């Protein structure tokens, strides 16, 4: 394990380029969440629902926004003050105190299999049993994990990190600084079949590619299929969680986020800055505009043309769901009122019948 690092509060503030308030000589040697932090930890407050911990936390320093520092300044604690987004400064602290642990296999391992026509850039790491197929290209300072396969004619840009047991099929194009977690499969053939007169299914050859642009992250056991004729594309900066299925000829826009176990059917186009909640299912051949948020387990059956928050199955605006839920919650009282009305109607009917019989 790496040696423990210790910074004074002032040194930490200088590294983060933030203001400091309190004892500048306080030693800081680690990071922790606000409810568990001890005197040697730096922590942060981003979500105000955790503000109940700030009074009693034993943290050596707390990262706050300027507005929060004014609000909690009377507590006489050590603060690191940022203009906004304390969580970003805290992430930098994590990177300072907890450096990444590499596999211990520097350079190109002797068991790695490299085709003679493949091109390997400078300072590339190839872990044990990595396979680089014909005419594949690996950019400078990229890292290919143990047992991963880079298919024929595929290209990876600079500073990519492909974790162990990843399969990147043939003719896949991956940009710079892309991270692919273990078990992901990129470029498999899409789920496309034709059924003949005898009811037998024949798989259709998929000729398209998968294009992954710069700064994309792909989670563990996620699958991105190639298109039948056109390419499947993941645009710049998009982050994809674990166990996500992206079908053939899907296009996902820039800086979107797709949460675990979501599935996007073929030929669907997702806009920029879209958030797709966990276990959401999106049908094929539709489009989702920019700045749409889909709650968990949303079922999207048709195109969405207006930004906003959507949920339910079929998907509908969040406000509409709230109104429907409120009405559903009122059903027991409505049933009770209907029962009372039925009894009154029965009573009135009986009185009417008696009045008709009485001479």
Curated annotation (Swiss-Prot):
EC number of the protein: 2.3.1.191
Catalytic reaction equation(s): a UDP-3-O-[(3R)-3-hydroxyacyl]-alpha-D-glucosamine + a (3R)-hydroxyacyl-[ACP] = a UDP-2-N,3-O-bis[(3R)-3-hydroxyacyl]-alpha-D-glucosamine + holo-[ACP] + H(+)
Protein name (record): UDP-3-O-acylglucosamine N-acyltransferase
GO terms of biological process kind: lipid A biosynthetic process
Self-association and partners: Homotrimer.
Family: Belongs to the transferase hexapeptide repeat family. LpxD subfamily.
KW Acyltransferase (keyword) present: yes
Record key words, sorted: Acyltransferase, Lipid A biosynthesis, Lipid biosynthesis, Lipid metabolism, Repeat, Transferase
Record InterPro entries: Hexapep, LpxD, Trimer_LpxA-like_sf, UDP_GlcNAc_AcTrfase_non-rep
GO cellular component: membrane
Function, as annotated: Catalyzes the N-acylation of UDP-3-O-acylglucosamine using 3-hydroxyacyl-ACP as the acyl donor. Is involved in the biosynthesis of lipid A, a phosphorylated glycolipid that anchors the lipopolysaccharide to the outer membrane of the cell.
Superkingdom of the organism of origin: Bacteria
Disulfide linkage: none
Pathway(s) served: Bacterial outer membrane biogenesis; LPS lipid A biosynthesis
Active-site residue list: 248 (proton acceptor)
Natural source organism: Chlamydia felis (strain Fe/C-56) (Chlamydophila felis)
GO-annotated molecular function: N-acyltransferase activity
């Amino acid at each position: 394990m790496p040696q423990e690092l210790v910074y004074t509060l002032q040194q930490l503030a200088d590294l983060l380029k933030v203001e400091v308030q309190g004892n500048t000589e306080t030693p800081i040697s680690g990071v922790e969440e606000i409810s568990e932090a001890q005197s040697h930890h730096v922590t942060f407050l981003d979500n105000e629902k955790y503000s109940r911990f700030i009074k009693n936390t034993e943290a050596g320093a707390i990262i706050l926004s300027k507005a929060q520092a004014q609000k909690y300044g009377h507590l006489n604690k050590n603060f690191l003050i940022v203009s906004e987004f304390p969580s970003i400064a805290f992430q930098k602290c994590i990177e300072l105190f907890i450096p990444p642990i590499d596999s211990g296999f520097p350079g190109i391992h002797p068991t790695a299999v490299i085709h003679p026509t493949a091109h390997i850039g400078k300072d590339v790491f190839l872990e044990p049993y990595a396979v680089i197929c014909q005419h594949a290209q690996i950019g400078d300072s990229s890292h290919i994990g143990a047992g991963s396969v880079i298919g024929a004619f595929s290209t990876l840009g600079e500073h990519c990190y492909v974790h162990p047991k990843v399969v990147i099929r043939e003719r896949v194009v991956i940009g710079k600084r892309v991270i692919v977690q273990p078990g992901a499969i990129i470029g498999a053939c899409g789920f496309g079949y034709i059924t003949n007169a005898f009811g037998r299914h024949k798989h259709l050859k998929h000729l398209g590619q998968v294009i992954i642009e710069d700064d994309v992250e792909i989670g563990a056991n996620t699958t991105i299929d190639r298109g039948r004729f056109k390419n499947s594309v993941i645009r710049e900066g998009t982050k994809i969680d674990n166990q996500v299925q992206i079908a053939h000829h899907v296009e996902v826009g820039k800086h979107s986020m797709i949460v675990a176990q979501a599935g996007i059917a073929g030929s669907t186009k997702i806009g920029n800055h879209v958030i797709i909640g966990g276990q959401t299912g999106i049908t094929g051949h539709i489009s989702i505009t920019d700045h749409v948020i889909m709650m968990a387990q949303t079922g999207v059956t048709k195109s969405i043309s207006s930004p906003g928050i959507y949920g339910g199955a079929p998907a509908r605006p969040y406000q509409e769901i709230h109104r429907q839920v409120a009405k559903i919650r009122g059903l027991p009282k409505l049933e009770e009122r209907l029962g009372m009305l039925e009894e009154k109607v029965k009573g009135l009917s009986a009185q009417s019948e008696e009045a008709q019989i009485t001479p």
